[in-house]
């Protein structure tokens, strides 16, 4: 609950101006509620209008994206880039291609990205972008033409010292490659750091593909060790999603001794009591681009349920939501608790509703918020930029070790900040406070014209 008068006033004004952007308002309210103890100690923030500036993007770019489909018909989509905050570094955040993309969702993601990037300790500001284009069902040539058209407008607003996009939902190595090629063509320059998630032959980083999923498990493992004197060993894990984050969270959790029993897509989920056959899922999703229901057709004992929201009714020790925002509501959270779940760490962005988070906290569930637990992807993007700047490549083991260190550091920064805020063990409060303080200090130092 917001009790600080300054923060209440800021939020009420924001609510009036952004009434049609519920995801953005939800993300802002969570942060403002968490940072109240910090703001109370810094009355100078109000005088400088710090919070008002922090919740307003520095810049939002909206543009049309015309492209020609294989039938020769002109199609038009809408493109966006939300450049939210550059106090601690160039804007950094992914590009999402999905029919659900709108300005409100990208503002929510860009706002979250500010604090996530801050927690990594790397010099990266916050941003997000994308389009309502749906790459599913499109040919490679259609995707290429769209990406080239998208970058033909976006290129003038980005660069390795200005704004460095990356992939997200609907934007993988193929799309990043097409956009990088068009940027290079338009600028006549090879700026490796202008986008991350590149192929290994032209400036990409080893371990980038695995980073978000691996990082989620490194964060969870450190939280288990330090807060519960426990580990993944012997635990049953429920994972939602079957994209990049889910696949590599499944891989690392299994390596750490857990048994992952579910994966899902937008149509439903599969339950395999023997443990998910990850090699099959990788082939299904990364090569054949099939649906998860095919898993149950080829694996004895596995069952498919045509309702992805029911994945949270499966008994487990640890839940790792890796699909999309607000996928766990109050009822799903209650089902998790009832069925023995004691740990929820988020691989997707804001996958739990505020009501679900209340259920976790009131039942003693160890809760790792997305801005802390899924920061591995952007952390390794930052490491990719570092390699590009140094004109060299690190080994998989070097990158993985740095990722592990960053994720363990994020846990400890979040935990220590939760103690300082008087909410020991509440990693949501801790992550928000730790991420906020670094950005706030930088903004104050750079003057109010910033």
Please provide the spans of the model-predicted regions.
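Adenosine-phosphate binding glycine-rich loop
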Residues: 2-27, 223-224, 337-450
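Flexible, glycine/charged-enriched surface loops at secondary-structure junctions
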Residues: 22-25, 43-48, 121, 158-167, ...
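Structured beta-strand/loop patches that form or line metal/cofactor-binding pockets in enzymes
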Residues: 44-73
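Glycine/serine-rich phosphate-binding loop and adjoining beta1-alpha1 elements at the start
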Residues: 98, 117-233
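General beta-strand structural signal in soluble alpha/beta enzymes
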Residues: 162-166, 190-194, 239, 262-265, ...
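Glycine-rich phosphate/diphosphate-binding loop of Rossmann-like nucleotide-binding domains
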Residues: 199, 204-313
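Rossmann-like adenosine-cofactor binding region
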Residues: 268-367, 372
């Amino acid at each position: 609950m917001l009790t600080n008068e300054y923060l209440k006033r800021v939020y009420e004004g924001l609510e009036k101006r952004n009434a049609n952007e519920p995801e953005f308002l939800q993300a802002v309210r969570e942060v403002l509620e968490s940072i109240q103890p910090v703001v109370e100690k810094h009355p100078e923030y109000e005088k400088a209008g710090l919070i008002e500036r922090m919740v307003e993007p520095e810049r939002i770019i909206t543009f049309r994206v015309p492209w020609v489909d294989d039938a020769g018909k002109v199609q038009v989509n809408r493109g966006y880039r939300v450049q939210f905050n550059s106090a601690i570094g160039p804007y950094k955040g992914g590009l999402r291609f999905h029919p659900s993309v709108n300005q409100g969702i990208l503002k929510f993601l860009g706002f979250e990205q500010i604090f996530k990037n801050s927690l990594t300790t790397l010099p990266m500001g916050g941003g997000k972008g994308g389009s309502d284009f749906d790459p599913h069902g499109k040919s490679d040539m259609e995707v290429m033409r769209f990406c080239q058209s998208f970058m033909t407008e976006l290129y003038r607003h980005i660069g390795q010292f200005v704004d460095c996009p990356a992939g997200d939902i609907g934007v993988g190595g193929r799309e990043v490659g097409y956009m990088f090629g068009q940027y290079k063509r338009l600028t006549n320059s090879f700026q490796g750091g202008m986008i991350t998630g590149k192929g290994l032959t032209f400036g990409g980083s080893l371990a980038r593909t695995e980073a978000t999923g691996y990082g989620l498990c490194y964060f969870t493992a450190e939280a288990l060790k330090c807060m519960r004197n426990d580990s993944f060993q012997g635990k049953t894990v429920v994972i939602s999603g079957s994209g990049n984050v889910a696949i590599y969270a499944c891989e690392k959790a299994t390596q750490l001794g857990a048994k992952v029993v579910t994966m899902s897509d937008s149509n439903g989920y599969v339950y395999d009591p023997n443990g998910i056959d990850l090699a099959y899922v990788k082939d299904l999703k990364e090569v054949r681009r099939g649906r998860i229901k095919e898993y149950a057709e080829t694996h004895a004992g596995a069952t498919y349920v045509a309702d992805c929201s029911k994945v949270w009714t499966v008994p487990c020790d640890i839940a790792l939501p890796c699909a999309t925002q607000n996928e766990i509501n109050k009822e799903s959270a209650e089902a998790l608790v009832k069925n023995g779940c004691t740990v929820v760490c988020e691989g997707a962005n804001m996958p739990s509703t505020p009501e679900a988070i209340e259920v976790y906290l009131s039942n003693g569930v160890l809760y790792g918020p997305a801005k802390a637990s899924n920061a591995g992807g952007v952390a390794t993007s930052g490491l990719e930029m570092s390699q590009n700047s140094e004109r060299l490549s690190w080994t998989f083991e070097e990158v993985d070790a740095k990722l592990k260190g960053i994720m363990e550091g994020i846990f400890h920064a979040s935990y220590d900040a939760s103690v300082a805020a008087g909410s020991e063990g509440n990693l949501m409060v801790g992550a928000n406070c730790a991420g906020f303080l670094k950005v706030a200090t930088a903004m104050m130092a750079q003057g109010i014209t910033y």
